[in-house]
């Protein structure tokens, strides 16, 4: 049987997620392969505005539209990841989906500060990661549900609506879910 990888899909935390850090989250999976998986939480605001973050990095950002930085995950919370539309043209960019990239280099932050060449974007501090077969085990135990990623879910919806919207992509109203997902 061929293994199915989940790159460019989203993990949805079930209502009874025991891990407080991941409770009520939607995670965009930027990479999933035979070595493991990495992703960014796309619905947990950090309380930091993009302008504030850029100014802290000595990047003048007076013209940046109000936009909140996300708490991307528990690992390396000091590291920034920019999930954005477009092609991987920045110094440290990788394509993770059709017209979707992750960039970690400062040049994209300069472009964001000057409203140059960056379409829709989310800046996240930190990321989530799973070792080989760890995510598969968590999914088989019912620790995560999976939905397709789309630009609306990633970029357009207010953060506090993304968890419910991810469930709706599955045709499910989460209010009706049992705390025993996968254990009928």
UniProtKB/Swiss-Prot annotation:
GO terms for cellular component: cytosol. Pfam families: DUF179 (PF02622). It comes from the Bacteria. InterPro entries: AlgH-like (IPR003774). Belongs to the UPF0301 (AlgH) family. NCBIfam families: PRK00228.1-1. This is UPF0301 protein ACIAD0353. It comes from Acinetobacter baylyi (strain ATCC 33305 / BD413 / ADP1). The lineage of its organism: Bacteria, Pseudomonadati, Pseudomonadota, Gammaproteobacteria, Moraxellales.
